[in-house]
């Protein structure tokens, strides 16, 4: 049985053949780079010789060279190919190597296979993200544990992100539902204007849809109009970092949907090619603590049901 998952660890454009990129994905320290042929590579970010981070090294035609003693590692296999102080008649022992990970590119993200099993029969996540027009992307490490980040994305996404000229409400439009391995929640939203009505709103011209994966994958967030036509789509990769923090990288775009009722600021931002959303790099602890636990209960229940042993599930 396959127990591993594909995890989006970085944006494709962040990984090159000049400087290795250090990331922490699902708690594992990795180094990403491209070899001399442009092939994407992922190794454990630790030299087996003196445990120095390989991300401090240099990409060479032969692989990734450790910055401490110059050991060089093949990016595809992790095998050590060069040790500078060996004589010409000496060979590098085959047991010397760094752990290599299966890695792939898809829909603008670098995905790394973490865990047991083979990824051959596991499709890469994010196939439902099909950008059109200009994209807006970024990365951050935020001050919240990964499990809490996913829960807040369901209970109160306004603590984590915002859409320009939009105010999210706590009015849920229907019950949470499972779709393609994600728990999906719809909530009402309104345009923010100087003539903003009272806090109690009965008409919601906008919908914010958040879809959180049960395991691995990417978070999908959409801003929709009342007829569920998409206005903005985001794909957010999240995973556990160190000391209770969360690694994020994201991509998003604005659709060509006409929005007659949008305020002038929305149209001006579009004309000036400004990002229609913002991912908060710092989380407001007071706002997070005030969130009521609601749809995230269903996320915990769905995970328990999905990953329960066969005997228990029966």
Locate predicted features.
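Acidic, low-complexity intrinsically disordered regions
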Residues: 2-3, 67, 109, 262
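C-terminal catalytic domain of Rieske-type non-heme iron oxygenases
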Residues: 123-314
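Hydrophobic, proline/glycine-rich low-complexity stretches
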Residues: 1-5, 23
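Short, low-complexity intrinsically disordered segments
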Residues: 4-5, 69, 111, 189
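Glycine/proline-rich, flexible active-site/cofactor-binding loop segments
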Residues: 8
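Rieske [2Fe-2S] iron-sulfur-binding domain
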Residues: 11-125
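Generic detection of intrinsically disordered/low-complexity segments and helix-coil linkers/edges
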Residues: 1, 63-67, 185
């Amino acid at each position: 049985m396959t127990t591993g998952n594909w995890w989006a660890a970085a944006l494709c454009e962040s990984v090159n053949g000049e400087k290795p990129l250090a990331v922490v994905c699902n708690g594992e320290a990795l180094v990403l780079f491209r070899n001399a042929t442009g092939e994407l590579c992922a190794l454990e970010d630790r030299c087996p010789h003196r445990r120095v981070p390989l991300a401090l090294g240099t990409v060479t035609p032969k692989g990734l060279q450790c910055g401490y003693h110059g050991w060089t590692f093949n990016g595809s296999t992790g095998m050590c190919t060069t040790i500078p102080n060996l004589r010409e008649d000496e060979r590098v022992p085959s047991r010397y190597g760094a752990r290599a990970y299966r890695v792939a590119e898809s829909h603008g993200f670098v995905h790394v296979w973490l865990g047991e099993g083979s990824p051959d029969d596991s499709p890469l996540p994010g196939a439902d993200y099909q950008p059109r027009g200009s994209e807006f992307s970024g990365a951050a490490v935020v001050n919240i544990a990964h499990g809490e980040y996913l829960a807040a994305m369901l209970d109160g996404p306004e603590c984590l992100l915002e859409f320009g000229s939009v105010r999210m409400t706590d009015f849920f439009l229907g019950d949470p539902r499972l779709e393609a391995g994600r728990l999906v929640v719809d909530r009402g939203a309104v345009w923010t204007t100087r003539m903003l009505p009272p806090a109690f709103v009965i008409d919601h011209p906008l919908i914010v849809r958040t879809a959180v994966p049960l395991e691995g994958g990417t978070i999908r967030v959409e801003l929709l109009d009342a007829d569920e036509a998409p206005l903005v789509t985001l794909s957010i990769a999240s995973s556990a970092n160190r000391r209770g923090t969360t690694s994020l990288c994201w991509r998003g775009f604005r659709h060509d949907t006409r929005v007659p009722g949008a305020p002038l600021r929305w149209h001006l931002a579009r004309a000036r090619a400004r990002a229609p959303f913002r991912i908060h790099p710092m989380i407001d602890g007071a706002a997070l603590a005030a969130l009521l636990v609601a749809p995230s209960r269903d996320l915990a229940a769905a995970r328990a049901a999905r990953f329960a042993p066969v005997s228990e599930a029966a």
